[in-house]
Amino acid sequence: MIAKVVVENAAYSFDIAFSYQIPPAMQEDIRPGCRVLIPFGKSNRARQGLVMSLEEGEESKLKPIRMLLDLKPLLNEEQLWLTEYLHKRVFCTYYEAMRAVIPSGLTMKVKVMCSLGEQQAMPPEPSAAQQRILEYLKEQKKPVYIGQLLMDLGLTKNAPALKELFRIGAVVFSEDVREKTADSKIVMVRLSDGYADLLQSGKIRMTQVRKKVISLLEESPSASLKEVCYYAGTTRQTLDKMEEAGIISYYGRQIFRSPYADRHQEERTDSGVTLESSQQMALDTLWHLWEKKEEGPYPTALLYGVTGSGKSQVYLKLIEQVREKGEGVIILVPEISLTPQTVELFGRRFGKKVAVLHSGLTMAERADEYKRIQQGLADVVVGTRSAVFAPLKKLGLIVIDEEQEGAYASQSAPRYHAREIAKVRCRYHKAMLLLASATPSIETFYQAQKGKIHLVTLSKRYLGNQLPKVQIVDMNQSYGFDISQELTAELADNLQSNQQSIILLNRRGYHTAVKCNSCGEVIKCPNCSVALTYHHANRRMMCHYCGYSRDLEERCPNCGSELMGFNGSGTQRIEDELGRIFPQAQILRMDVDTTMSKLAHEVKFQEFAEGKYQIMVGTQMVAKGLNFPNVTLVGVLNADQSIYSQDFRGCERAFSLLTQVVGRCGRGTLPGRALIQTTSPDHPVIRQAAMQDYDGFYRDEIKTRKLALYPPFCTLCQVGFSGENEEYVRYGAMWFAREFQKKASGEYKDLPIRMMNPCEPVIARVAGKYRYCIVIKCRMEERFSRLMWEMLRAFDSEKKHKEVHIWVDLNGNDL
C-alpha cells in the first residue's frame, strides 16, 4: 500500500500527487484526508503533505512517511473532492485549495528545531562560525528554532557553517509540529467510579467540606472546578487532596470560543413571521422545488424582489421547513457588516444551532465554530464567502443573499466564486441553491430568463410600503460643493422630524489626492501607481492598496512650492462638512477606517438602530441589506463614480449600488425619499436606478454584453503576472501569450478562444510589484482547463520566470 501525497508550498510545475511508503506503524491509522510529514526533494527536507488517496503499488523504492499528523482525517470525502475540484477548476495548487476548505486555525505549523548531536561527531578544529553555533546550542540546553538561532547569531539563511555541522552530525535537526490554535478547555470534576467503596471502607477521613463536594456531585454528575469551589465553599487545594485520595477525578471539556455565545438563546418553535399572500406563494413555489430535489438535478432558484419586499422572511420560513426535515442550511452574506443583522434574525429563531463564520472572528473562534458545525452542534451557518465550505454533513439548502455582489469572488488564491462552490456542493448533496437579490447579476438573470434556473418574483414591498421617491440632482453647476442645497434642505427636514438619514459616498479618507497647484504634481505611493489619500484625523497621506503612509507634504517634492492643494472628497470630509452644517446632529461614519476593531460593525449599527445618531455617512457597507425603519432619507454623492470605469461590469455595479442604497429608506411606516447627486443626470443607468427599473437595465445591458462578447456569452479568463522587476514581468507575459497562441492554433484549434494582447492593468504596480495581464475569452470546458494547466506548468518550469508570479482568475472582479 502506498500513499499519494500532495505537498505544501508547491509550484505549478510540481503540484502533483507523489507516492510515499507507509511505515508499518501507520498502516492502520493513515487515511485519505490526513496530513503527514514527508521528506521531500533531493535534500529530503521535511514538508507537510496531504494524503489524497491510498493505492496498491510497489513501495520498496519509495521514501517512507516520517510522521502522521492527524489521528483521524482532517478532510472528509467531500472536502477532498472539493480540494480536487478547486485545483482543476480555478487553477490553484492543492494546498491553496485545502486552505480554503478549512479555517486557518486548523492548519499546522512545522518548525525546524536545532540541537547538538553526538559528542563523537564534534569537529576537532571548528571554524569560528561553527564554534559560535556549538556554544550557542550548548547554552540553550534544549532544541532551538532554527530561525531564532540564525537571528541571534546574525547568520544568513544558507549558513555554510551550520550546513557543515549538520553534514557531519555535530548538529541535528528535528520538527516541532502543532496546530496554529489549540482547543480551549476547562477543568471539570466528577466522582470517581469507586468513590462509594472508598467511603464505606472507612479509610477516608470525611470533613464537612468533603461531604458538601460529594453531595454536590451526586446531584450534578459533573461540574466545572470553578463551580464546585463556589457552591461547596472550598478551594482547589482541598479538591486536589480529594483527587489524590481517589474520591473525585478531573477531566478536560472543550469549550467553544464565540463572540456570539452570550446571545445565543434557546431554539424557538416558530419565527413569529407572518407572510403576505405574495410571499406565501413564493414560499410554496420554493418548497415544491425543494421537495423535488431528489428526483433529478439539484434545483436552483432566483428569488428576485424589489428592495424591502421581504425576501429574507421568505427564506427564513423555507429554512424552518428544511430543518424540520433534518437537513442543514448555509446562508451567505457579502460583507461582515451584514452579518450582525442576519445573525440576530436567525439567532432569535434557531438559538445555539446557529454558527457564524467570517474574517472578523479570531483564528481560534473560526476554528471553534467550524468544529461545532463538524460535530453537529450547529446546523444553520451564517457567514461571508468562506462559509460556503462549512462542513455540514447533511446539507439541504444554500442561500446566497445579494448574490450579485463582487465580494463573493476571492481576490487571492484560490480565486473561486462562492456561487460556483455552492453549485457544486448542492450537486454533491442533492441540495437546493437559492439566490436572492433585488438586482441580480446579469449572468444569473440571463439563466433565469433562459429557464435554466427557476425565477420566483416579489414585485411589491412588504406591508404595502411604497418604493422611495427619487430626485436626480444635477451637480454640473455646483462646482466646489459636495452637498447640494436640495440635499441640505432634506436633511434639515429629517432632523426636524426626528427621522434618520443615510449618506453614501463610496470613497474613504478626507481628500482623494494631494496636488501641487504650481506644477500639477500629484503625490503618489512609492510602492503603487496610485495617488495617496489624505486622512485628516492623523494628518497623514495613506495608500489604500499597500498601507504605506507618510506625513502631509508641506512642500511639493517636485518643484518645492508651498502651494499644495487637495482634490476630491472622501467620507471623512463629508462627515466634517455635515458637522459644520448641522452642529447639533449626531453623525456616524461607517468605512474601513472606523470599523477596524472587532465587532465594530455590530456595535455601530446597533447604536444607529437605537437612535443615537441621526445621520450615517458611509461607503458601500451602508448600501446593502440593512433594515432601519426610521431611515426615511438617502443621499448619494458622486453617483457617477463607477459608471465610467474600464471594467465591463462598471454599469452593473453602479446600478446595483444605487438601487440598493435607495432601497434602504422607507422600510417602516413612513415613506422614503432619495436624492442622487450626479454630473450625468441623463445617463440611462442613473435614470433606471432612480426608477428601480432592473428589467429595463437588464435589457440594455444584455444587448451590450452580447455585442461585445462578455459574460454570460463567454468565460473571461484573466492570466496575471507580477514581480519586482518590470522587464521580467513584461517578458513573462509576452512569453505566455506567444506559447499560448501556438497551442491554441495547433492541437487546441477546435476550442473557441479569443486572446487579447498582454497589457498593464489600470493600476500597474501594487505593493512594489509590477503587473501585467492577458484576457482570454473562452468557453470553460475540460479541454480548455487542460490547455491552461499545460501552460502554467510550462511557464513555471522556465528558469527565466523564477522571479515572476503567475495566477489565473475566471470571470474575476478586476477585469
Q: Which residues fall in each region the model found?
A:
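Generic structural signal for residues in well-ordered beta-strands
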Residues: 171, 248, 354, 472, ...
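A carboxyl-terminal module marker
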Residues: 742, 746, 751-766, 806, ...
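C-terminal structured "cap/appendage" subdomains that terminate the fold
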Residues: 751-781, 787-791
